[in-house]
Amino acid sequence: MFVRSNILRALIFTVLEKTCLEIKMMHSSCKGLVLLLFLFVVVFIGNTDANAQWEVSHKVRASPHENMGRNVIDGSGVEKTLHDIGMGEKRGTHNKVSVSTVALFTLAMAAATGLGAVPFFFVELDPQWAGICNGMAAGVMLAASFDLVKEGQEHGSGNWVVTGILAGALFIWLCKQILEQYGEVSMLDIKGADATKVVLVIGIMTLHSFGEGSGVGVSFAGSKGFSQGLLVTLAIAVHNIPEGLAVSMVLASRGVSPQNAMLWSIITSLPQPLVAVPAFLCADAFSKFLPFCTGFAAGCMIWMVIAEVLPDAFKEASPSQVASAATISVASMEALSTLFESFTHDYNSEDASGFFVSLLFGLGPLLGGVFLVASAVTFRLQHALLMGVASGIAFVLGLWRPLQLLLSAKMGLIPLVSLLAIGAGLSHFTSSTILNVTGRKKSRAGSLINPVTNFPTSVITLQSLLACGAVGFHALAEGLALGVAAPNAYGLGRHMVLPVSLHGLPRGTAVASCVFGATDSWHAALAAAALIGFVGPISAIGSILAGIDYSGLDHVMVVACGGLLPSFWQVIKRAVRLERRKGSVGMVLGLACAVVCLTFTRLVCLHTPYCNSAPEAVR
């Protein structure tokens, strides 16, 4: 082995020596390519010797009794062939997960990237926000590069990671030089320097998806099989959403439509499923290339952030705004990665099941929002009626759980009223403070239109949004209880998504009705319902990761219920002043809708086993 390595080194250096004589005659881009090749070859030769020496010493230590027939006598005295050992491991791991399962899960993981473009269907960016978005994109890309470097170091030699970083930076610099030589570049109706930057950003994010796809494939082929692969897939799917947001922000800040931004965000993640399947089938081979690939993608992103993305951000926003946006983005991404890492290092099958089930808790509010918007558009429901519906539902949600606790003697009247008063006081104080601050700013600006969202920011709209915030806090408290229950579900109780979705349906209806009545925008109503739907799963996942129990959750729930009452009292007062009859009818409809949904949830839990582990908060 050493003789072959020396011969290979001599041949390569002979060729390089002759090639160097012609470098002076080459173009500048060719010189860079030769330099990149030279750097790669030098590190390759060094690592070849190091790996060969490590392999020999490792074999001597691991199997000193090795015979000439490739038979190894292990520590237990059992004689096995190396071929049988390797084939046995591969057969064992591949029998656990099918190729189609890996392909379907990774396709869904890649599609999650498109969710990052959803906000731009409802928001138009002014120049200052475009600069802040570029700062956020820079933070996301930097955080992704940190994770790539760490992942590469975990899979092999740090030398390959360093080589990949340098090679990636050199590669992206050469690509920029080549694009500039072609003159004006156009893409998605963008021309000139902006088009060049868009091409580079999309290309870099696509390159870095190769490493993530191979990592997912290798995780499915690991010793823990499907459970480990599922957790890694879910982690990267959640991780893909802010990365899709980063790509969409770069595109939207340059005038690209939301549809195209979503399409290109998904395209940047398509290498994940394309690489995951081969990586699953050839896990050992892909593991050896991961360190260089992750370092290469990290080097590309670091160079692009410093050379292109941040300078563009500084043109539109102040340095403090850009720095704050980038820092918050990095901190958020690293916090997300830390949570998933801690979970994957110490988990069991129950946690994995609860983690997966928790993602489905948002279906109820989303369906409620869709139902409300469809009804409002079809029957041309008036604003007063819609606000009355929202208030009626909120009053039922605010009183349902406190009455359960009181009637079951799990909480006394005085503590219950005290917690409701605390929630109401906090809600009133927060709403009053925000309305006063916003009112002073409006009086100085002399405008009632927000240039960022194009939605009227009148007192009516602000009160409606604050009321939706109270519903969000209620969903968060309920999600904590669901997260405690999800890992303990058994039998048909694993399907408690049915009662939970039915329980959450009036919440989405209330939010969509409130927003639609205030803004007359079905886009905003659906977005608000979807956002409230996300609060429950995120809260449930957080409780699983934190490992909390039921103690104290009823108190949090009662405080959240108290916050609903004053918020929607203002909404119903406004609806009655606008049109007394329709506001009153809407409130009655809302009360009836909420009572019917919650009663049916109770009946499902009483007469089916779907709620055998669900908390009382959703029964």
Swiss-Prot record:
Family to which this protein belongs: Belongs to the ZIP transporter (TC 2.A.5) family. ZupT subfamily.
Q: What is this protein called?
A: Putative zinc transporter At3g08650
Which top-rank group of organisms is this from?
Eukaryota
UniProt-listed InterPro entries: ZIP (IPR003689)
Key word Kinase present: no
Q: Where in the cell is it found?
A: Membrane
* Any GO CC annotation of this UniProt entry: membrane
Indicate the transmembrane segments per the record. Answer: 25-45, 102-122, 129-149, 155-175, 198-218, 230-250, 261-281, 289-309, 354-374, 383-403, 405-425, 465-485, 528-548, 552-572, 585-605
